[in-house]
C-alpha cells in the first residue's frame, strides 16, 4: 500500500507544484447519445435526423448552455492519435468542411468554433471488452438466463431513451442521460457482470476491469491536457462512459467535477 501511495504522489507532482489556492481545474463530462447511429455498442439507440431544422435549433440551444461553462479546451471521443480530427477541424474553421451527423461535429466542432478555439482534443483509447467470455461462461455454467435478464434490462433502458428522445429536445435528452439516477443504473449493469466467474475464470470481473482500464486511460488523456489551475475542460463522450469518468474526476483531489445540471440550474427530467 505504501508503494501505491508513493506512486500516486509522484504522479501528482506537476499539478501539486502550482501555487496553492482553492482554484482547481474543472472537468465536465457531457454524456451523449450517438447522433449518427454508428451501431458500435451492444445495445444502440436509434436517433432521428439531427440535421433536421428542428433538431438544429435544439443543437444551437444546447451550445448556448454549454458556453456557460466557459470551456478552455474541448475533448472528444476520437482516437488520441488521430490526425484526421485536426484536419477536419481546421477545414471546418476555414469553411471547407461540412458537419456530419456525429456528435463530435454537431456539438464539439460547433462549440469550439464559436468559442474561438484553434484546436480540439481527441482523447479516446480503444480497449478490450471480453463479453464473449462472459456469454460462454454463463452458457457453460447454467447462468444464461441471469445474463439474458441483464441484457433485457439494458435493452429496455435503451428503448426508454429512444422514446424519450422522440418527445423531447436535444438538451432535455442530454439532461436525462446525464442525470445521477440514470448514470447509476448504467454503472449498476456493469457491476451485475461481476458474479459471472469463479477462481481462475474471472470472466465477469475481467470484463469490468477492462472497462475500468479503458476509462482510466481516457481520463489520463484528459488530465494530460491541463496546463493551469484555471483550466476548464469539456469532455464530450458516449453516455456509457459517463459514470466511470465522473468517478475518476470525483476521486482526483486535484480537479473539480462539474455536471450539466450546474449549467441549466434545474433538475433533470426523469
What are these regions (language model features)?
Residues 17-23:
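Boundary at the C-terminal end of the N-terminal hydrophobic targeting segment
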Residues 70-76:
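Proline-aspartate-enriched helix->loop->beta-strand connector
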Residues 208-270:
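A cross-kingdom marker for long, charged
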Residues 1-7:
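Sec-dependent signal peptide recognition
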Residues 34-55:
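Acidic/histidine-rich helix-loop elements
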Residues 48-63, 93, 220:
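N-terminal post-signal-peptidase region of extra-cytosolic proteins
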Residues 87-226, 248:
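Hydrophobic, often amphipathic alpha-helical segments used for membrane interaction and targeting
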Amino acid at each position: 500500500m505504501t508503494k501505491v501511495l508513493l506512486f500516486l504522489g509522484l504522479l501528482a507532482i506537476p499539478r501539486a507544484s502550482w501555487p496553492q489556492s482553492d482554484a482547481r481545474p474543472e472537468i465536465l463530462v457531457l454524456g451523449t447519445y450517438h447522433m449518427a447511429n454508428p451501431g458500435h455498442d451492444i445495445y444502440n439507440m436509434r436517433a432521428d435526423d439531427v440535421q433536421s431544422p428542428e433538431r438544429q435549433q435544439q443543437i444551437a440551444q444546447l451550445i448556448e448552455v454549454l458556453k456557460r461553462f466557459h470551456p478552455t479546451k474541448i475533448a472528444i471521443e476520437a482516437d488520441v492519435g488521430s490526425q484526421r480530427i485536426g484536419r477536419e477541424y481546421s477545414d471546418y474553421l476555414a469553411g471547407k468542411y461540412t458537419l456530419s451527423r456525429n456528435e463530435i461535429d454537431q456539438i464539439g466542432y460547433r462549440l469550439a468554433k464559436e468559442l474561438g478555439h484553434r484546436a480540439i482534443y481527441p482523447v479516446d483509447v480503444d480497449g478490450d471488452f471480453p463479453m464473449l467470455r462472459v456469454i460462454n461462461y454463463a452458457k457453460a455454467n447454467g447462468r444464461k438466463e441471469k445474463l439474458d435478464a441483464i441484457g433485457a434490462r439494458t435493452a429496455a433502458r435503451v428503448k426508454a431513451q429512444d422514446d424519450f428522445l422522440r418527445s423531447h429536445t436535444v438538451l432535455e435528452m442530454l439532461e436525462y442521460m446525464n442525470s445521477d439516477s440514470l448514470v447509476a443504473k448504467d454503472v449498476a449493469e456493469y457491476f451485475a457482470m461481476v458474479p459471472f466467474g469463479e477462481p481462475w475464470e474471472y470472466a465477469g470481473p475481467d470484463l469490468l476491469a477492462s472497462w475500468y482500464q479503458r476509462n482510466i486511460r481516457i481520463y489520463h488523456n484528459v488530465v494530460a491536457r491541463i496546463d493551469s489551475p484555471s483550466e476548464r475542460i469539456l469532455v464530450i463522450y458516449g453516455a456509457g462512459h459517463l459514470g466511470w469518468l465522473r468517478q475518476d474526476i470525483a476521486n482526483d483531489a486535484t480537479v473539480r467535477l462539474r455536471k450539466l445540471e450546474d449549467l441549466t440550474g434545474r433538475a433533470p427530467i426523469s
